[in-house]
Amino acid sequence: MENREISAPFIGIVRHRLATDGKGVTTLVAFHGCPLRCKYCLNSQCLDSKMVWRTITTSELLDELLLDNLYFLATGGGVTFGGGEPLLRSEFIDAFCRIKPAEWKINFETSLNVDRSHLERVLPHANEFFIDIKDTNPAIYKEYTTRDNVQVLDNLRWLLGHEGVAERIIVRLPHIPNHNTQEDVDRSRAMLEEMGVKYFDEFDYMVKEEVITSKK
């Protein structure tokens, strides 16, 4: 396929992350835009169109990330796409992965609440997925995010149906103040284990106040 120059809105870059999201040193590329409206959004600037840092092209991003090339090669690290919801920028990511050095690992921090076509586009490039599942209970998920989670679970089943992909998935199970309990988290974990998920990151959301976001 011919390499194409594509642009995408993004918030910024966080360099030299270690033991945060995959092996080696990684650099986070945070895109603007998200389908969810979480009550305790940890990166609410991704929802505000006035706070887009800038639009970047695939070649411009490559130039930015080549500054970290020695770290990636020395540690087996690479790029983590986050946001916001990075899978909404799957066309951009696909184009970027066609021009990046082959040695760079590609990871995703995602909610999986996107159309299947986005996953199909990025799966050939993905080394690891860090999936923020929120909660598998549909009522809890919708109350917290304002969205349904049917697509999330369907996409997770689809990923797990690919040979070897379960070894590259880490599901994040948050304790969300005022929204779920330890019993809810345990129930989610049991359901996900039954689906074939092997690796989990269970943690507490540390929040100061509820984020007021639009449901549009």
Feature roles, as predicted:
Residues 27, 79, 106-108, 129-131, ...:
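Hydrophobic faces of well-ordered beta-strands that scaffold small-molecule active sites
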Residues 11, 25, 43-125:
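Conserved Radical SAM active-site core
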Residues 7-40:
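N-terminal pre-triad scaffold of radical SAM enzymes
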Residues 120-136, 189-201:
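Structural recognition of alpha->loop->beta junctions
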Residues 95-96, 122, 151-158, 184-191:
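A general structural detector for well-ordered alpha-helical segments in enzyme core domains, enriched
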Residues 86, 112-119, 129-145, 178, ...:
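Conserved radical SAM core fold
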Residues 156-184, 188:
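Conserved strand-turn element in the central/C-terminal portion of the radical SAM core barrel
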Residues 8, 175-216:
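Radical SAM enzyme [4Fe-4S]-AdoMet core and its adjacent flexible, acidic
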